[in-house]
């Protein structure tokens, strides 16, 4: 891998050459407009990005796997899938920009037909099948967005699709896959069990297996997101992409670095399953322990042999985000942007919102919102915990005399402060209160932490023992 400190003259020549390529190879007016704007990037005014952990690992002397995807492959993929996919907007957000300190845009792949970017790669793969392969049908193993992507792509092309999913898959995802006329087989308790069964069925019936990320055609299909980003905002300084197996970031990196070598491509992983970060640090594909995470769409224990060398060469840095940061990002996007995203879809914004990425203050940054297929029960928990941490949902445990009027007195205090009582619960047995007392729990909807403290102080002034429960 070439070091990141490439000379300005070499990079400007590369940009100029790439600009010429996209002008000659692409016919859309939007692409030609993007290429014209990109000529401004040939000015030798930028500084090379600092050497990242990715560059250090790639230069460690470990042998690199071959790169099996080209810019031309991504252009070809775009021509193939164009009529099947929605060119999602890259929406600038003044509100989020003010919150994060950068000029932030969201590439809303959650608006695709299946609710995620996955259909891009699946379509590109399925459209390349031979007549014999199409007749036999396709098979995939997935508990999430890949299942719906394959099912949708197969349905649009009149091909039978069989999807093997773990028995623990939420009913909503099973039904979502079945809506595209796929045959769903529930097998085992994990993805590994489902994958093994899918392999057995492939050999038995001659199906074509559609991998979730580790296939050159899948990578090229996902890379069409990068081409759209270049056309929609050719002056981007950085693009933030969630990483699972690496198919999306690999495709985006090839597409965008070909046209604009100075753009920063930053990957984001769940802290519980940092397989790409571990692999890059080791200089080879390294499997990590599979763990439960709210970002289940990027919980991949082992990255791909096709995706890894692309990330080694083109991705500038990889950061991680924890569960609380992801959950909070989901809530912020829903409340402030009216955008519903799943855990993996929120990972990129979580990294920006929590200032995990250096050097982007004041810069033009795009975050790829990869999907919006979140389980409703999980969303409800996220919202409730988020409201509790923000002080807008409060649980007060109060010891009161076990006599008529005690609860009414507390309720009057709460009403005076104009808080809303959501629930009241008694506990006369499992409490430290004396036999003449009882513990009452008030669940309140408030205006925030300061409002809660006012209520607590007022209750205490009336000689009640009150305790504010801390959120989990």
Task: Identify the residue ranges that each predicted region occupies.
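Polybasic, lysine-enriched low-complexity intrinsically disordered terminal tails
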Residues: 1-56
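PLP-dependent amino-acid enzyme catalytic core
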Residues: 3, 39, 43-472
